[in-house]
Amino acid sequence: GGEILFIESSLSEGKGNLSITGNLGKIMKESAVIALEYIKSNYQDLGINKEIDYSKYNIHIHVPEGATPKDGPSAGITILTSLVSLFTQKRVKKNIAMTGEITLRGKVLPVGGIKEKILAAKRAGMKEVILCHENEKHVVEIPTDYIKDIQFHYVREMSEVLQLALN
């Protein structure tokens, strides 16, 4: 779609539950599960404390504006970035937008609606946008004058996303 979504995540003592709220569809919920599994498999590379016992914490992912239904794989890299930020306490840069599907191995896959998403990012004042390298062909369809103030980053792996997005 053509609107910016914000992703919030929190950690609390609990029993290892993953809660996902914000009127999300099945595919978007699956993206959250994939993101958490990726973190559990790659915690060392991500700089996450190996002592974390996930069974003693509840993780809550929320996408505000719950009245609006949301679905699709496009928020995968954003959900994963939010969770890595939560576990490492590294802040996500301001004025950065991202979209892309993730795999369990951390690959970033292309998504649809790129033109609409970039126009929404521009309206929201974003200065940087992270996309799958396969979506670059969709960016060239947008008039250069309109997006000249946005820096685009084309990635293949989640490690690249995290390097670009986290302070």
Regions found by a protein language model. Name each.
Residues E3-N167:
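Peripheral, non-AAA+ core regions of ATP-driven protein-machinery
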